[in-house]
């Protein structure tokens, strides 16, 4: 079975017999917050009973954190679970995606036989989403996905363009999904979120996750925000009733209290991203100037395999529609780890 995502630490260990320095997964480099680990341990006595299928306590905490009504929140087994639930609930006939973007959108759409239309983003624009994407929405489109910032490019779509996209989708009868799973890494997140549009846009769904910012990828926890509670009810009914374990629910509530940890992650990324980008450029590589906790760059096609032999993993992006072999994505990690990546690349590329 071929995997399409990064973060396959188990596959690397099985192949090489040891763990890699993993730059292929875009999670916090500071590890699981201690408060979250403690909450998981404290919740172990609840493992002998079914979890709350409505995630009541977690949704209450999320409502406070997001400053939104609890009925506008649906929790899931990671953002990917919610992507599939939405697609299964809507069963769209035709959907629009930018290319490149996160692979799971297309995978979910194809699982219901949906025709996937892609609007290619251009290297000349640093793969930015432009007005052309808004204009590509028409009456034949049922569902639109926008990743903010986009994965793997790290590009931010300006809020004004997002607003126009929301209006265009509403006029055409399409549901718009804005995936903000990486937005919380940005210090300017409050100015970029689409949350203020929810009140007047029942066709808007925002996806968020604990996976990345809190290094909880193995816990599996995400949530959707939408003012259309009937749509959220359909999404709830589209999957299994106990989608979020009691341990994940406890972990999520604890993570929301880890404000100092989250601030530290944001500060680290803001400090290290430009330094890592400069280091890659110093190696003669083309780097896309994104804003996320990862960087997209172009290098010799053999780079990924050569780094794996030296214990370092990148995300090869050649399987993204809209990108070719030789494009790679690297996470931004701690200063020593980033320097180890650059030093290993110097040895490989010399």
Question: Which sequence ranges carry the predicted segments?
Answer:
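Active-site phosphate-binding strand-loop segment of PLP-dependent enzymes
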Residues: 123-187
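PLP-dependent aminotransferase class I/II
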Residues: 31-33, 54, 203-288
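PLP-dependent aminotransferase-like
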Residues: 88-146
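PLP-dependent enzyme catalytic core of the Aspartate aminotransferase-like
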Residues: 309-310, 319-350
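Short loop-beta-helix segment that forms the pyridoxal 5′-phosphate
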Residues: 51, 63-85
């Amino acid at each position: 079975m071929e995997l399409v995502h990064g973060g396959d630490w188990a596959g690397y260990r099985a192949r090489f017999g040891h763990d890699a320095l993993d730059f292929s997964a875009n999670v916090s480099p500071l590890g699981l917050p201690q408060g979250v680990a403690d909450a998981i341990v404290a919740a172990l006595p609840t493992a002998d009973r079914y979890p709350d299928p409505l995630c009541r306590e977690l949704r209450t905490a999320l409502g406070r954190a997001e400053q939104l009504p609890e009925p506008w929140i649906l929790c899931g087994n990671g953002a990917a679970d919610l992507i599939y639930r939405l697609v299964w609930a809507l069963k769209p006939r035709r959907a629009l995606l930018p290319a490149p973007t996160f692979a799971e959108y297309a995978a979910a759409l194809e699982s219901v036989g949906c025709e996937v239309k892609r609007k290619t983003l251009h290297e000349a624009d640093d793969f930015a989403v432009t007005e052309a994407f808004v204009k590509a929405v028409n009456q034949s489109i049922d569902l639109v996905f926008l990743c903010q910032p986009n994965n793997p490019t790290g590009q931010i779509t300006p809020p004004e363009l997002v607003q126009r996209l929301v209006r265009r989708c509403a006029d055409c009868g399409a549901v718009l999904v804005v995936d903000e799973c990486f937005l919380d890494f940005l210090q300017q997140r409050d100015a970029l979120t689409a949350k203020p549009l929810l009140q007047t846009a029942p066709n808007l769904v925002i996806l968020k996750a604990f996976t990345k910012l809190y290094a909880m990828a193995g816990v599996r926890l995400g949530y959707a925000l939408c003012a259309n509670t009937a749509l959220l009810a359909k999404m709830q009914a589209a999957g299994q009733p106990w989608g979020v374990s009691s341990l994940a629910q406890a972990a999520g509530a604890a993570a929301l209290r880890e404000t100092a940890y989250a601030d530290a992650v944001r500060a680290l990324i803001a400090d290290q991203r430009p330094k890592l980008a400069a280091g890659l450029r110093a190696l003669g590589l083309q780097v896309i100037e994104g804003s996320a906790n990862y960087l997209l760059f172009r290098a010799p096609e053999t780079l990924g395999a050569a780094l794996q032999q030296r214990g370092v993993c990148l995300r090869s992006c050649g399987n993204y529609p809209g990108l070719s072999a030789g494009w790679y994505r690297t996470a931004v990690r701690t200063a020593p780890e980033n320097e180890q990546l650059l030093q290993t690349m110097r040895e490989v590329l010399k």
